[in-house]
């Protein structure tokens, strides 16, 4: 099995908890015998391709003019991720499924689901509604719409807490049989 994971955060790009989650999940999957390719945003100082055992990280860089706003930046990242994934597929890489993390990767995830005929799994770490205690402007409504759309397109929607599962059911009406609760893990030795 070969998982194509999409995340805008992956070390050294660490903004919140998604980077650590995706890194630890990817490494855990490789220890289980799966092959994992992560597509992520890449700063100039990070290697464009990095291998860690069965994990391969592809960091895509912006090759287009600098975007004017957040939505333009997200679209550009998705186009660059899509271009890299299609290049890997054209070069013989055979992926088994796409796993998208949060709304930022939704466009590339949907295109790969349909373009390569792959199952799509999505982990929703937080919602725009939850981050802002409601939706108060057009950008927040847009992001929430993309989050709903990602949940709709996904074969399975993964969340990390009971709270988030209930929020996804309430805000996006995600059916219970589509939701999977997989709590974040810890390394007990870090607390010894």
Where are these regions (language model features)?
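Carbohydrate-associated surface elements
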Residues: 42, 163, 185
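A short, charged, and often flexible helix/loop element on the N-terminal side
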Residues: 55-89
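N-terminal subdomain of nucleotide-sugar transferases
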Residues: 1-56
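Acidic anion/phosphate-binding donor-loop and adjacent secondary structure
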Residues: 169, 177, 186-192
